[in-house]
Amino acid sequence: MSEAPLILLAAGGTGGHLFPAEALGVVLMKRGLRVRLVTDSRAMRYSGLFSADMIDVVPSETVRGRTPWALARTGVMLGAGTALAIGLMMRLRPAAVIGFGGYPTLPPLFAARALRIPTLIHDANAVMGRANRLLSRRVSAIATSLPGVLDRDPELAAKTTTTGTPMRPAILAAAAVPFAPLDAEEPLRLLVVGGSQGARVMADIVPGALDELDPALLRRLALTQQVRDEDMSRVRAVYDRLKIACELAPFFSDLPARLAASQLVVSRSGAGTVAELGAIGRPSILVPLPGALDQDQFANAGVLADAGGAIRIVQGDFTSERLAAEITALAADPQKLTAMATAARTVGRLDAADRLADLVMQVARI
């Protein structure tokens, strides 16, 4: 009896890339296919579905500069990674290779093209990421989370399907939890996160903002905040002084459940975060990561803000005073919070993993 077809999933080693890959993997396995993950060494923290024997680490390199030395180093690392990926694929013989963005996807996708293996890339951002842009003209098909991402390029648009962002089972379970309207007598459940890698700006700004709040509102706060290890002591010192009921950690493995329990989220606006806020339907204050060449987080935050589900604040305007004012205004207007939660949900697509799995099987001719 022959083995089931194998689908190789390639993703950068952060949650924003790995979680959609995991969500697709769950659906493909339910359909009787085999899956493996190709990534970098960072992925073990977020591996989830993928046990160690289902993961292949291939060296890659992020483009970190334009000097001849930096470009040469990048070229050498990508070349070595591609050679290893070719050997891996000749051994595994996948039916298709699916990329989810990040520079670690370049070697396996380059190798797949060299071996004439069908390929597909998925991009969750409102602006396509750089690694996916490098691959876009070389792959068999493209999937995007949002409509219109490639409409300005007829050649790419012709092979693009809008699927949404695949959601892990934990997110789908959280999406079934209804938003709890804010009650003046109950705690305000505030969740502060900075993406899968954390964000120092939250440690710099949020404690000062909470220090600005009216004491009556401060006493109602039930705070959960992602804080990097190096920032933990100074953040905790402020909250201890303010006597805030809080839970602080560098990483929350149960973040979907915490999102579901929240009534207001303060966060960066990576593609995965925005998609999960839409799927679960929670109001948010989003602070896009500044300095990105393509301003993808600014565009991502705009998707939720334009729908009425979020307030977007650029980092230059993200001060303790501004955040305190926004939290105070929202806490005083429970109906607005509920309306934002409803609006956010209009952005989410809960069937995205199945839609992407359909496209994968079409590309792989299964």
Swiss-Prot record:
GO terms for biological process: carbohydrate metabolic process; cell division; cell wall organization; lipid glycosylation; peptidoglycan biosynthetic process; regulation of cell shape. InterPro entries: GlcNAc_MurG (IPR006009), Glyco_trans_28_C (IPR007235), GlycoTrans_28_N (IPR004276). It is a peripheral membrane protein. One of its GO terms (cellular component) is plasma membrane. The keyword Transmembrane helix does not apply. It holds the Pfam family Glyco_tran_28_C. It is found in: Cell inner membrane. It is an enzyme of class 2 (transferase). It catalyses: di-trans,octa-cis-undecaprenyl diphospho-N-acetyl-alpha-D-muramoyl-L-alanyl-D-glutamyl-meso-2,6-diaminopimeloyl-D-alanyl-D-alanine + UDP-N-acetyl-alpha-D-glucosamine = di-trans,octa-cis-undecaprenyl diphospho-[N-acetyl-alpha-D-glucosaminyl-(1->4)]-N-acetyl-alpha-D-muramoyl-L-alanyl-D-glutamyl-meso-2,6-diaminopimeloyl-D-alanyl-D-alanine + UDP + H(+). UDP-N-acetyl-alpha-D-glucosamine binds at residues 14-16, 125, 168, 196, 297. Its EC number is 2.4.1.227. The keyword Protein biosynthesis does not apply. Keywords: Cell cycle, Cell division, Cell inner membrane, Cell membrane, Cell shape, Cell wall biogenesis/degradation, Glycosyltransferase, Membrane, Peptidoglycan synthesis, Transferase. Cell wall formation. Catalyzes the transfer of a GlcNAc subunit on undecaprenyl-pyrophosphoryl-MurNAc-pentapeptide (lipid intermediate I) to form undecaprenyl-pyrophosphoryl-MurNAc-(pentapeptide)GlcNAc (lipid intermediate II). This is UDP-N-acetylglucosamine--N-acetylmuramyl-(pentapeptide) pyrophosphoryl-undecaprenol N-acetylglucosamine transferase. The gene is murG.
